From Swiss-Prot:
<keyword id="KW-0489">Methyltransferase</keyword>
<dbReference type="InterPro" id="IPR029063">
    <property type="entry name" value="SAM-dependent_MTases_sf"/>
</dbReference>
<dbReference type="GO" id="GO:0000139">
    <property type="term" value="C:Golgi membrane"/>
</dbReference>
<dbReference type="GO" id="GO:0032259">
    <property type="term" value="P:methylation"/>
</dbReference>
<feature type="compositionally biased region" description="Polar residues">
    <location>
        <begin position="227"/>
        <end position="238"/>
    </location>
</feature>
<feature type="glycosylation site" description="N-linked (GlcNAc...) asparagine">
    <location>
        <position position="244"/>
    </location>
</feature>
<feature type="glycosylation site" description="N-linked (GlcNAc...) asparagine">
    <location>
        <position position="163"/>
    </location>
</feature>
<feature type="topological domain" description="Lumenal">
    <location>
        <begin position="39"/>
        <end position="770"/>
    </location>
</feature>
<feature type="topological domain" description="Cytoplasmic">
    <location>
        <begin position="1"/>
        <end position="17"/>
    </location>
</feature>
<keyword id="KW-0812">Transmembrane</keyword>
<keyword id="KW-0472">Membrane</keyword>
<feature type="compositionally biased region" description="Basic and acidic residues">
    <location>
        <begin position="131"/>
        <end position="177"/>
    </location>
</feature>
<comment type="similarity">
    <text>Belongs to the methyltransferase superfamily.</text>
</comment>
<keyword id="KW-0333">Golgi apparatus</keyword>
<feature type="region of interest" description="Disordered">
    <location>
        <begin position="44"/>
        <end position="238"/>
    </location>
</feature>
<feature type="compositionally biased region" description="Polar residues">
    <location>
        <begin position="205"/>
        <end position="220"/>
    </location>
</feature>
<feature type="compositionally biased region" description="Polar residues">
    <location>
        <begin position="92"/>
        <end position="109"/>
    </location>
</feature>
C-alpha cells in the first residue's frame, strides 16, 4: 500500500514536472538577480573580505573626514589597492572550492554575510547543481563593483585637491603646511577626543541585515558622487551672498536694525543702542575691510594693531592727548593710558590696590566688570595681575572703542545700561569698575546703580573713579551728594576715598553688604527690596527695576560665602552645589568633577597637540555652549581668554562658571551676538547645533559664526553625525577647510579653518540700510 501510494504521488509529479521546473528557475533567477543588484551597491566591502568594522571605518573616515588632499596619497591608495587585490584572489579561491561541492551542501564563508546573502544561499542550495556557476558570476560582479568604488575614491581625492587650491585671497595655502601632520595625528588622538572608549570602539559597527534601509556604505558612496560635482554646486545650493548694509564690514544685525531704530518713540534711555534683532536672521556673509590682515599676536597686540583691520581715526583724534590711541603709519598704537590714567594702566591698577589692600588682585578679586571701558587698557593690563576683566560699552559711543579692545585681544562686548538687565546672573562679579564711564548712576531712583548691585557679589567692591570724587565744582558736588545719599540707602559701605597725585585723579571704593541687617533697619524702604518672586538670575530681555534683592544668608545657598581664592576656585566644586542635580543627571558635584576631568583630558592630549592649531595665534576664544566652563578651565594656563556662553534654553550653569573665576554671558543663538565681526580666533561648539536645529535656521547660525570668526580662525564642533554632516556641507560651500575629523558611534568632531573667501554676489538687507 505504501509503495502504491508513493507511485500515485510520483505520477502526479510527472504530469506537472515542467511547470514546477519553470517556476523554480524563475524564482531562482529573480533571487539571484536581486542579490546581484544589491551586491553591486552594498556588498563590495564584504565581498572583498572586509569585516563590518572595516566598513564602518571607511564610512566614518569619508563621511566625516579630514580634507583628502592632506593625506599621503601613496599610503592611502596603495594600501587599499593591495587589500582589494588580495581580497579578489581570496574570492576566486573560495568560488572554485564551492563549485566542487554538492548542490545541497551548505557552503561556509570566512566573511560575515548579510541577511540578503544568507537568503540567496539557502535558495541556491535548494536548486541543486548548476547554481555554483551563477554564484561565481555574482562574486565577479561584486569584485568589479569594488574596483569601481576604489576609482570613485581616487577621483574624489583628486577633486578635493583641486577644490582646496582655490582661495579668494590666496591666504588659504599657509594652513596646508600643517594639514598632513594633523591627519597623522587623527587616529592617535581619538582616545583623547572621545576618552570614554578605546580606538576600536570609535569605529565599531555590527553587521546587520539591510532590509528596506539604506546602508552606511551606500550613503557614503552617494555622498562621494555628490561631492564630485564640485563645491560650486554647494555654493549655489546655499546661495551665499555678501551683505550689502550701511555698516559694511562692521555689520552687527541686532544693533544695526535701522528699521526698528527709526520706529523708536524715544532714545532717552539709550534704546537705540539696545538689541533690535531683525525678524529673520541674515543668511549673508559680512565683507572684509580693504587690506585686512591677520591680527597681531598677543601681547604685542595690546600695544598696536593693524589700522586696516579697524580703519577708524576719530577716536585717535579726540582722545590722542589722553594716550588712548594714536596713529603710527600702518598701525594704531595704544600707549596704555586712559582718561583716568594718562601715565599708564598698571600704575592706576596698583593705585587701586594700595587704596584698599583687601581687594587683592588675582587672589580674592578675580572676575570684574568694567563699565564704559574706552579701549579697555584697564582690562588689558589686569592680565598682569591674574585678573579677568569683562569690559563693555555701547556701540559707537566713542567710535569703535569695543572693536579696538577686541582687536587688541582684550575681553570686551557691546552693551548698554538702558532699559534692560545686563545679560549676567546676579551676584557674580567680585568687583565692578567705572572710570569716567559717563553713566548717571544717581537719577531715576538709582535704577542703573541698582542693576550693578544685582550683578555684584555680596562683599564685592564698586570702584568709582570719576570727577565727582575729586572735583568740587557745582555740578560734580551735586552729583557726589546724590551718590552719597543713594549708596547709603543701598547699604553700601564707603570703604575709602583716595587720590592719585601722579594722574591727578581720585577713586571712591564701596562695598556691598553681606547680610540683610542694614536693609531691615532702614527708616524708609527706598530703594525698595525686590519681591521674593523676582529672580535675580533672570537676565535675558528682562526690564530693569529700581529694587534690590535680599542678600542670601543661608550658607548652603549661592552668594552666602565668598568663593575660594584664585586659582583654587577654578577646580573646586562650590559647596552650594550639594543640594542640586547636575546637568548630566548625577549629583552636581560629581557632574562638575567628571566634566572637569573630561575637558582636561581632551584639551591636554588632543586639542593642544593633535588638532593642527597654532595656539600662539589664538587669543580670543568662545565656548558657545559652556555648561560648567570645563573647556575654559582646561585652557587657563594659556595666554588667552574664553567667553563662556550659556544658551538661554540650556540649564542655567553660568553662576557656576563665575564661581570658578571665569566669566560668560547668556545668549540665544537664533539671534546675532553682541560683538563686531571678526572678533574671535577660535569658536568651540559642543553639542550645540543638534539642539539649535529644533528651533533655529542653521544656515543663519553658520552665517553668524562666519561673521564673528576671524579669517584663518578655527571652528571646533562636536555633535551627532547627522548634524556634523550638515555643518560640513555648509562650511565647504563657504570654502572653509575641514582640517580634522573624528568619530565614535554616532558622535563626531570637526576642526575647521575659516577661509578668506567672500561671495561676489551681494544681498541688500533692508533692515540694515540707514
Amino acid at each position: 500500500m505504501a509503495m502504491g501510494k508513493y507511485s500515485r504521488v510520483d505520477g502526479k509529479k510527472s504530469s506537472s514536472y515542467g511547470l514546477t521546473i519553470t517556476i523554480v528557475l524563475l524564482l531562482s533567477l529573480c533571487l539571484v538577480g536581486t542579490w546581484m543588484f544589491m551586491s553591486s551597491w552594498s556588498a563590495p566591502a564584504d565581498s572583498a573580505g572586509y569585516s563590518s568594522t572595516d566598513t564602518a571605518k571607511d564610512v566614518s573616515k569619508n563621511d566625516l573626514r579630514k580634507e583628502e588632499g592632506d593625506r599621503d596619497p601613496k599610503n592611502f591608495s596603495d594600501e587599499k589597492n593591495e587589500e582589494n587585490e588580495a581580497a579578489t584572489e581570496n574570492n576566486q579561491v573560495k568560488t572554485d572550492s564551492e563549485n566542487s561541492a554538492e548542490g545541497n551542501q551548505v557552503n561556509e564563508s570566512s566573511g560575515e554575510k548579510t541577511e540578503a546573502g544568507e537568503e540567496r544561499k539557502e535558495s541556491d542550495d535548494n536548486n541543486g547543481d548548476g547554481d555554483g556557476e551563477k554564484e561565481k558570476n555574482v562574486k565577479e560582479v561584486g569584485s568589479e563593483s569594488d574596483e569601481t568604488t576604489q576609482k570613485e575614491k581616487t577621483q574624489l581625492e583628486e577633486s578635493t585637491e583641486e577644490n582646496k587650491s582655490e582661495d579668494g585671497n590666496g591666504n588659504e595655502e599657509k594652513a596646508e603646511e600643517n594639514a598632513s601632520e594633523t591627519e597623522e595625528s587623527t587616529e592617535k588622538s581619538s582616545k583623547e577626543v572621545f576618552p570614554a572608549g578605546d580606538q576600536a570602539e570609535i569605529t565599531k559597527e555590527s553587521s546587520t541585515g539591510d532590509g528596506a534601509w539604506s546602508t552606511q556604505l551606500v550613503e557614503s558612496q552617494n555622498e562621494k558622487k555628490a561631492q564630485q560635482s564640485s563645491i560650486s554646486k554647494d555654493q549655489s545650493s546655499y546661495g551665499w551672498k555678501t551683505c550689502n548694509v550701511t555698516a559694511g564690514p562692521d555689520y552687527i544685525p541686532c544693533l544695526d536694525n535701522w528699521q526698528a531704530i527709526k520706529k523708536l518713540h524715544t532714545t532717552m534711555h539709550y534704546e537705540h543702542r539696545e538689541r533690535h534683532c531683525p525678524e529673520e536672521s541674515p543668511h549673508c556673509l559680512v565683507s572684509l575691510p580693504d587690506g585686512y590682515k591677520r591680527s597681531i599676536k598677543w601681547p604685542k597686540s595690546r600695544e598696536k594693531i593693524w589700522y586696516n583691520n579697524v580703519p577708524h581715526t576719530k577716536l585717535a583724534e579726540i582722545k590722542g592727548h589722553q594716550n588712548w590711541v594714536k596713529m603710527s603709519g600702518e598701525h594704531l598704537t595704544f600707549p596704555g593710558g586712559g582718561t583716568q590714567f594718562k601715565n599708564g594702566a598698571l600704575h592706576y591698577i596698583d593705585f587701586i590696590q594700595q587704596s584698599h589692600p583687601a581687594i587683592a588682585w588675582g587672589n580674592r578679586t578675580r572676575v570684574i566688570l568694567d563699565v564704559g571701558c574706552g579701549v579697555a587698557s584697564f582690562g588689558g593690563y589686569l592680565f598682569e595681575r591674574d585678573v579677568l576683566a569683562l569690559s563693555f560699552a555701547p556701540k559707537d559711543e566713542h567710535e569703535a572703542q569695543v572693536q579696538f579692545a577686541l582687536e587688541r585681544g582684550i575681553p570686551a562686548m557691546l552693551n548698554v545700561m538702558g532699559t534692560k538687565r545686563l545679560p549676567f546672573p546676579g551676584s557674580v562679579f567680585d568687583l565692578i569698575h567705572c572710570a569716567r564711564c559717563r553713566v548717571p548712576w544717581h537719577i531715576e531712583g538709582g535704577k542703573l546703580l541698582l542693576e550693578l548691585n544685582r550683578a555684584l557679589r555680596p562683599g564685592g567692591f564698586f570702584v568709582w573713579s570719576a570727577t565727582p570724587v575729586y572735583r568740587k565744582n557745582e555740578e560734580d558736588s551735586g552729583i557726589w551728594k546724590a551718590m552719597s545719599e543713594l549708596t547709603k540707602a543701598m547699604c553700601w559701605k564707603l570703604v575709602t576715598i583716595k587720590k592719585d597725585k601722579l594722574n591727578e585723579v581720585g577713586a571712591a571704593i564701596y562695598q556691598k553688604p553681606t547680610s540683610n541687617k542694614c536693609y531691615n533697619k532702614r527708616p524708609q524702604n527706598e530703594p525698595p527690596l525686590c519681591k521674593d518672586s523676582d529672580d535675580q538670575n533672570a537676565a535675558w530681555n528682562v526690564p530693569l527695576e529700581a529694587c534690590m534683592h535680599k542678600v542670601t544668608e543661608d550658607s548652603s545657598k549661592r552668594g552666602a560665602v565668598w568663593p575660594n581664592m584664585w586659582p583654587e576656585r577654578v577646580e573646586t566644586a562650590p559647596e552650594w552645589l550639594d543640594s542640586q542635580e547636575g546637568v548630566y543627571g548625577k549629583p552636581a558635584p560629581e557632574d562638575f568633577t567628571a566634566d572637569q576631568e573630561k575637558w582636561k583630558t581632551i584639551v591636554s592630549k588632543a586639542y593642544l597637540n593633535d588638532m593642527g592649531i597654532d595656539w600662539s595665534n589664538v587669543r580670543n576664544v568662545m565656548d558657545m555652549r559652556a555648561v560648567y566652563g570645563g573647556f575654559a578651565a582646561a585652557l587657563k594656563d594659556l595666554k588667552l581668554w574664553v567667553m563662556n556662553v550659556v544658551p538661554v534654553d540650556a540649564p542655567d550653569t553660568l553662576p557656576i562658571i563665575y564661581e570658578r573665576g571665569l566669566f560668560g554671558i547668556y545668549h540665544d543663538w537664533c539671534e546675532s551676538f553682541n560683538t563686531y565681526p571678526r572678533t574671535y580666533d577660535l569658536l568651540h561648539a559642543d553639542h550645540l547645533f543638534s539642539t539649535l536645529r529644533k528651533r533655529c535656521n542653521l544656515v543663519s547660525v553658520m552665517a553668524e559664526i562666519d561673521r564673528i570668526l576671524r579669517p584663518q580662525g578655527t571652528f571646533i564642533i562636536r555633535d551627532d553625525m547627522e548634524t556634523l554632516g550638515e555643518v560640513e556641507k555648509m562650511v565647504k560651500s563657504m570654502k572653509w577647510k575641514v582640517k580634522m575629523t573624528q568619530s565614535k558611534d554616532n558622535e563626531g568632531l570637526l576642526s575647521i579653518e575659516k577661509s578668506w573667501w567672500r561671495p561676489e554676489e551681494t544681498e541688500t538687507i533692508k533692515s540694515a540700510i540707514a
